[in-house]
Curated annotation (Swiss-Prot):
The gene is dapA. Pathway: Amino-acid biosynthesis; L-lysine biosynthesis via DAP pathway; (S)-tetrahydrodipicolinate from L-aspartate: step 3/4. Keywords: Amino-acid biosynthesis, Cytoplasm, Diaminopimelate biosynthesis, Lyase, Lysine biosynthesis, Schiff base. It catalyses: L-aspartate 4-semialdehyde + pyruvate = (2S,4S)-4-hydroxy-2,3,4,5-tetrahydrodipicolinate + H2O + H(+). PROSITE patterns: DHDPS_2 (PS00666). It is found in: Cytoplasm. This is 4-hydroxy-tetrahydrodipicolinate synthase. NCBIfam families: dapA. One of its GO terms (molecular function) is 4-hydroxy-tetrahydrodipicolinate synthase activity. The keyword Lyase applies. Is insensitive to lysine-feedback inhibition. Shows ASA substrate inhibition. The keyword Lyase applies. The lineage of its organism: Bacteria, Bacillati, Bacillota, Bacilli, Bacillales. It comes from Staphylococcus aureus (strain MRSA252).
Length: 295
């Protein structure tokens, strides 16, 4: 079995203009990603501000992306919530719209235990019968999918990958011991750790920064797969990532996507844009990165 994708999947932002989803900007952004070697597009995830999107908006965004991508790369829909039945219904709708896979975050707020996680994820996978990417992000959910639980879930025929945003390499190694990486993919959920994540056998990354540098971030993965040492190649990307860490995702990345012309620099409350001085510094860091490419 091949993996859902290898290399860089982009956690897509949602462009707004006057607080409305800007479909033309969305299409322009997706075209930019496809032209610059993105290997998958993840829609309606954390970076998309999914908590503040309506159901109708999520479906419109997903349908727009699916139609535009036209099977050139996988489109993965973020459909997970802390309500199993709502997650099932959202996932069924995503499948009906043509999504290639779904991504399911661990339940948050009400949370659960590990047995509950197994039942939650398996119930959705059983109902939808579409490839599932588990999304483990304890910094946002205060809930983790333990390695033993990943092992159980990896045996389900439709649960095929883990987005690992733990930034914990001991966790990665424990998971690796328990799964078949030929059929179950491990994707980093942290752009800043990809060098070591790839060295330790990860199949790719679900990336924020790839919204603006997809080609360069995919080139990093390709170089690693070719057996090259990518530490030096990563350094300018690492500098840009440091600038991007000025605030909570997706606040900074939208300062850059808007800079590239993909919608206004707008977020929905409770998220707010960077201060003007921070926006200027971040955009200058992007300009410096791009200028370095041309030297």
């Amino acid at each position: 079995m091949t993996h859902l994708f290898e290399g860089v999947g982009v956690a897509l932002t949602t462009p707004f203009t006057n607080n409305k989803v800007n479909l033309e900007a969305l299409k322009a952004h997706v075209n930019f990603l496809l032209e610059n070697n993105a290997q998958a597009i993840i829609v309606n995830g954390t970076t998309a501000e999914s908590p503040t999107l309506t159901t109708d908006e999520k479906e419109l965004i997903l349908k727009t992306v699916i139609d535009l991508v036209d099977k050139r790369v996988p489109v993965i829909a973020g459909t997970g919530t802390n309500d199993t039945e709502k997650s099932i219904q959202a996932s069924i709708q995503a499948k009906a719209l043509g999504a290639d896979a779904i991504m399911l975050i661990t339940p948050y707020y009400n949370k659960t235990n590990q047995r509950g996680l197994v039942k939650h994820f398996e119930a959705i996978a059983d109902a939808v019968k579409l490839p599932v990417v588990l999304y483990n992000v304890p910094s946002r959910t205060n809930m983790t999918i333990e390695p033993e639980t990943v092992e159980i879930l990896s045996q389900h025929p439709y649960i095929v990958a883990l987005k690992d945003a733990t930034n914990d390499f001991e966790y990665l190694e424990e998971v690796k011991k328990r799964i078949d990486t030929n059929s179950f993919a491990l994707y980093s959920g942290n752009d800043d750790n990809v060098v070591e994540y790839y060295q330790r056998g990860g199949q790719g990354v679900i990336s924020v920064i790839a919204n603006v540098i997809p080609k360069e971030f995919q080139a990093l993965y390709d170089a690693q797969q070719s057996g090259l040492d990518i530490q030096d190649q990563f350094k300018p990307i690492g500098t840009l990532l440091s600038a991007l860490s000025v605030d909570i995702n997706p606040i900074p990345i939208k300062a850059l996507t808007s800079y590239l012309g993909f919608g206004n620099y707008e977020l929905r409350l409770p998220l707010v844009s960077l201060e003007d001085t921070d926006t200027k510094v971040l955009r200058e860091a992007y300009d410096t990165f791009k200028a370095g490419e041309n030297e």
